[in-house]
């Protein structure tokens, strides 16, 4: 065998890994400071392949342990009051997402021919509901429960590439951060994008002006949702030509988007009234307006979302649409006291650190719920603001009043008719 190794000593013509010289092997590849023979290349290739297969088997075992829809729903219910249909929808969607991943890994491990030609597509979810109805809380609770990468982003910060704001790839960046830049885990994660209605087109008509936070962002997000290889800057921020990028395949990432879609009910109402001109308007008079708004949203069709300002291709990528209803007074009362981290429990813990017991009469809880319902734009989010206003003076004065042992809040305190009842030591 003539390998043309003129100018090299006998010692330098040996494999750096096994020590065989160039006469004992078929091929010896020489680099700047090391050499490797064809035997070692074949050996190392087998090692890497085995590691990959073992990793797939481990991933499959991890996916086998994934919680059932009942488990997911039960956990959501410990933190989120009401919205039973939405919780069930999310539980099934997340479970099916991981069944889909498990099926893919199972085929790689077992080379099974059963349903081998059947491709399981993603079922991305669109959540529609008023502010304070629990969309973000549901996403945050899911993120805590699932041992998988789960990130939450805000659509209002996203702009087209080249404009002030965040690139759409930042939603993938946040997912990478959640799993310490483990690309394999990120590629099977879940992304929740809040305020998705804020990137609706300003008008159905084509405009000559640039809509940098509307249709352009929808087009850019569409590519990620459909499945593409995204090039992500390693430390976030804008892309620069000289920097290296992390490549993330978004094909298996599940996307959940949420928004209030204010005014969507009117679009649905117009469509239905056009189709049922006689009798429909009469029913408006007979129904409670808030109940009607919720029932209208339950009849939402893709064409309504398109008229609202979402592009058809974007709407088409969300086969699951789930509606969150406005919270009733009884549900707001339950939110105050029942969840694991209920607001009342949080403030009781704060007072407990000052060795003071905080109690709320049932009448006070109902009064707080009534106040929250009066501010229709905030929903459950208004509960904390109301509690802060009620308890502010107490939280300010109590650290200097060592003898106070208990504070009682009733409905008169909530409505500003009296001050909290204080109980003292001895």
Swiss-Prot record:
This is ATP-dependent Clp protease ATP-binding subunit ClpX. Keywords: ATP-binding, Chaperone, Metal-binding, Nucleotide-binding, Zinc. GO terms for molecular function: ATP binding; ATP hydrolysis activity; ATP-dependent protein folding chaperone; protein dimerization activity; unfolded protein binding; zinc ion binding. Belongs to the ClpX chaperone family. Residues 3-56 form the ClpX-type ZB domain. HAMAP family: ClpX. Pfam families: AAA_2 (PF07724), ClpB_D2-small (PF10431), zf-C4_ClpX (PF06689). ATP-dependent specificity component of the Clp protease. It directs the protease to specific substrates. Can perform chaperone functions in the absence of ClpP. Coiled coil: none annotated. Component of the ClpX-ClpP complex. Forms a hexameric ring that, in the presence of ATP, binds to fourteen ClpP subunits assembled into a disk-like structure with a central cavity, resembling the structure of eukaryotic proteasomes. The gene is clpX. The keyword Glycosyltransferase does not apply. GO terms for biological process: cell division; proteolysis involved in protein catabolic process. GO terms for cellular component: HslUV protease complex. Zn(2+) binds at residues 15, 18, 37, 40. InterPro entries: AAA+_ATPase, ATP-dep_Clp_protease_ClpX, ATPase_AAA_core, Clp_ATPase_C, Clp_protease_ATP-bd_su_ClpX, ClpX_bact, P-loop_NTPase, Znf_CppX_C4.
């Amino acid at each position: 065998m003539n390998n043309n190794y003129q100018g090299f000593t006998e010692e330098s013509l040996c494999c750096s890994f096994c020590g065989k010289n160039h006469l004992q092997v078929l091929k010896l590849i020489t680099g700047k400071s090391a050499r490797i023979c064809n035997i070692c290349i074949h050996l190392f290739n087998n090692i890497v392949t085995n590691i990959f297969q073992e990793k797939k088997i481990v991933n499959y075992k991890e996916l086998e342990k994934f919680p059932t829809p009942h488990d997911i729903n039960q956990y959501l219910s410990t933190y989120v009051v009401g919205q039973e249909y939405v919780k069930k929808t999310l539980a099934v969607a997340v479970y099916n997402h991981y069944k889909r991943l498990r099926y893919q890994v199972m085929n790689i491990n077992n080379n099974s021919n059963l349903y081998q030609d059947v491709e399981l597509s993603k079922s991305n979810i669109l959540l529609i509901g008023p502010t304070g109805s629990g969309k973000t809380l549901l996403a945050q609770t899911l993120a805590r429960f699932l041992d998988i990468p789960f990130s939450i982003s805000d659509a209002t910060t996203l702009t087209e590439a080249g404009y002030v704001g965040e690139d759409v790839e930042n939603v993938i960046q946040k997912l990478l951060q959640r799993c310490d830049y483990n690309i394999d885990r990120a590629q099977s994660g879940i992304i929740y994008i809040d305020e998705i209605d804020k990137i609706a087109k300003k008008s159905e008509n084509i405009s000559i002006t640039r809509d940098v936070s509307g249709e352009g962002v929808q087009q850019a997000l569409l590519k990620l949702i459909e499945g593409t290889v995204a090039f992500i800057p390693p430390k976030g921020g804008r892309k620069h030509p000289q920097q290296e990028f992390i490549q993330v395949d978004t094909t298996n990432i599940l996307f959940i988007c949420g928004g209030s879609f204010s005014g969507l009910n009117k679009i649905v109402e117009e469509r239905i009234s056009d189709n049922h001109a006689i009798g429909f308007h009469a029913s408006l008079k007979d129904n409670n307006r808030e109940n009607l708004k919720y029932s209208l949203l339950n009849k939402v069709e893709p064409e309504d979302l398109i008229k609202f300002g979402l592009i058809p291709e974007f709407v088409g990528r969300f086969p699951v649409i789930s509606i969150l209803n406005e919270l009733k007074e009884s549900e707001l009362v339950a939110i105050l006291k029942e969840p694991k981290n209920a607001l009342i429990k949080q403030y009781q813990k704060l007072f407990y650190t000052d060795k003071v017991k905080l109690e709320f009469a049932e009448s006070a809880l109902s009064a707080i719920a009534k106040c929250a319902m009066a501010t229709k734009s905030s929903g459950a989010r208004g509960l904390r603001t109301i509690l802060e206003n009620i308890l502010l003076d107490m939280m300010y004065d109590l650290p200097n009043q060592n003898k106070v042992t208990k504070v009682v809040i009733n409905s008169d305190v909530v409505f500003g008719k009296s001050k909290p009842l204080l109980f003292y030591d001895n």
